[in-house]
Amino acid sequence: RDFYAAPRFSPDGSRLAWLEWDMPGMPWDGTEVMVADVAEGRLGHARSVAGGPTESVFQPEWSPDGVLHFVSDRTDWWNLYREEPDGTQRNLTPLEAEFGVPLWELGYATYAFLSDGRIACVYRRDGVHHLGMLDPIIGGVDR
């Protein structure tokens, strides 16, 4: 691959998630979230979790309990997703709203995990920025 960004270790240090993409594409056009096991300081086999040439993904993060979350534009809106134990991904914010930003600014974060299990998030809807709280089990955003 040509570009790598946003490496994040799982809370127990056993897995690493990151973004990658190829030239001539731009990261807001198509990226992938990759995950690999980590053992003795080395990466094991990497697998693609989400994204591709026509789907852009952003901000892979592990929740405190070790569940991978990321933002994807697969619905044409940057929504927040959670990878379920069976490998499927669930849209936690199925809204016509933007929970991500194009990756011309690396390191930007639009969500963070709270100690009570909820997720604090920033999103744009109808051109207005909002701060919300999200329950990752039931989904939906409260302002």
Where are these regions (language model features)?
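Signature of short aromatic-glycine-proline-rich micro-motifs recurring in repeat-based ectodomains
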Residues: 105-114
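A flexible loop/linker signature enriched in serine peptidases of the S9 family
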Residues: 1-4, 19-34, 48-58, 70-82, ...
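Residue-level detector of Asp-centered blade-edge/turn motifs that repeat once per structural unit
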Residues: 11-12, 63-65, 114-116
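Beta-propeller fold detector
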Residues: 44-50, 89-96, 142-143
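Short loop/turn segments that connect beta-strands within beta-propeller blades
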Residues: 38-41, 84-87, 135-139
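Hydrophobic beta-strand positions that form the internal "hydrophobic ladder"
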Residues: 13-16, 68-69, 119-120
